[in-house]
C-alpha cells in the first residue's frame, strides 16, 4: 500500500518533469532545434494538422532549420503557418525546401524567455508539491484507518519528502541549463 503511493507519486513527479522539458523545448533559444516548430499547425485540406505530419524538419546549421514538405502543393500553406505562428520566424522557400533562419535574440527577448522559463519551472515546482501533498494525505488516511502505524506513516512521509526534494532539484538543474542556453550569445 505504502509502496504504491510512493510509486504513484514518483510517476506523477516524473511526468511533471517531462512536461517541463516539453515546455522548455518550446521556448526559443538562438539555436535551431526542430522542436521549436512542434506547436505550428498547418491547414491541410481544411483540417489543422501538426507541421511534423506534413513536412520533415531538420537542422541545416546552428541557426537554420530546413523543411522538406511531403506534398509540394502544401509549400505555401506551410510557409504561411510558420509566418502566422507567434514564433517570430520568417521562412524562405527555395524550390521544394523551406529554410527557416533563426533570428538572433535581443537582450530584451532573452530576458523575456528567461522569465517565461522561470514561470514554467515554478509551475512544475507547484505541481510536484501538490503531488507530495496528495501522497501525504493518502498516507494520513491509511494511518487513520489503522492500516499502517504512525511510524510507517512518518517513514513513508520522509521518503515522499526526499522524492520531492530530488525532483525539485532536477527542476532547478533543468532551469539553470535553460537559462544558460538562453543567455549564451
From Swiss-Prot:
The keyword Magnesium does not apply. Coiled coil: none annotated. It holds the Pfam family RRF. Keywords: Cytoplasm, Protein biosynthesis. Responsible for the release of ribosomes from messenger RNA at the termination of protein biosynthesis. May increase the efficiency of translation by recycling ribosomes from one round of translation to another. Belongs to the RRF family. This is Ribosome-recycling factor. The lineage of its organism: Bacteria, Pseudomonadati, Pseudomonadota, Gammaproteobacteria, Pseudomonadales. The gene is frr.
Amino acid at each position: 500500500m505504502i509502496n504504491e503511493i510512493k510509486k504513484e507519486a514518483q510517476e506523477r513527479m516524473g511526468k511533471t518533469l517531462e512536461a517541463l522539458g516539453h515546455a522548455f523545448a518550446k521556448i526559443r533559444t538562438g539555436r535551431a532545434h526542430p522542436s521549436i516548430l512542434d506547436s505550428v499547425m498547418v491547414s491541410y485540406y481544411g483540417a489543422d494538422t501538426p507541421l511534423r505530419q506534413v513536412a520533415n524538419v531538420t537542422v541545416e546549421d546552428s541557426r537554420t532549420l530546413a523543411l522538406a514538405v511531403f506534398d509540394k502543393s502544401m509549400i505555401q500553406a506551410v510557409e504561411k503557418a510558420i509566418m502566422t505562428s507567434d514564433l517570430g520566424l520568417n521562412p524562405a522557400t527555395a524550390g521544394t525546401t523551406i529554410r527557416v533562419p533563426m533570428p538572433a535574440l535581443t537582450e530584451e527577448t532573452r530576458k523575456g524567455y528567461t522569465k517565461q522559463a522561470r514561470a514554467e519551472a515554478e509551475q512544475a515546482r507547484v505541481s510536484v508539491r501538490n503531488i507530495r501533498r496528495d501522497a501525504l494525505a493518502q498516507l494520513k488516511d491509511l494511518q487513520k484507518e489503522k492500516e499502517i502505524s504512525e511510524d510507517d506513516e512518518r517513514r513513508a512521509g520522509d521518503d515522499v519528502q526526499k522524492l520531492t526534494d530530488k525532483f525539485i532539484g532536477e527542476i532547478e538543474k533543468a532551469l539553470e541549463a535553460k537559462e544558460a542556453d538562453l543567455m549564451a550569445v
